[in-house]
């Protein structure tokens, strides 16, 4: 289980990076973020209400809104500067609303057909996050988590380590991203989020499946009621 210190990294990593996030996540994943978001969307077959946790600048939130134009989509994030960008970039959507809140602590009156979270799991306590998601899920609802994983294949892991080292070097030249690009590789290497969340989802009565993406550089975990 990750400690509270992992969650405390969020403001250190992201408070000053909202306006540049979209570009950095594209180049920082070698363009794979768009592919990963597409794979997340493929896990969503239908629904009238969606909750996107750690929505950031609203990249995934807007993609869900585009796929389900008649649905209600709520995005939650703990960082105000990111929500400011999300709201600005989502002006053309009338079915999206954003809330400043903590993914582990939010309480809403609504329940949702699907709850998504990309790049969030490694920062949270699995027991707390899953319990809160289940409490906001409809009877036939589905949870979809996505995050980085540390590749198991030695050859792929070698390339991944090289790329993470490159990101650390890049971070030294971008002041606002220095903490994130230096700290994230360490967090990714030590995180066992996929195993932890799989166990907790199963204990909460969810049907669990997972899918590795890009040779194990990230993964999608689903839990369905």
Locations of the language-model features?
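Conserved alpha-helix/loop element of class I SAM-dependent methyltransferases that forms part
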Residues: 30-47
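A short SAM/SAH-binding and catalytic strip from SAM-dependent methyltransferases
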Residues: 114-127
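A short acidic, Gly/Pro-enriched loop at the edge of an enzyme's catalytic core
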Residues: 104-115
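N-terminal, positively charged/glycine-rich alpha-helical extensions of SAM-dependent methyltransferases
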Residues: 1-20
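A short glycine-rich, Lys/Arg-flanked "PGG" loop and its adjoining helix->strand segment in the class I
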Residues: 128-139
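C-terminal alpha-helical "lid/dimerization" subdomain adjacent to the S-adenosyl-L-methionine
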Residues: 8, 149-200
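Class I SAM-dependent methyltransferase SAM/SAH-binding core
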Residues: 51-105
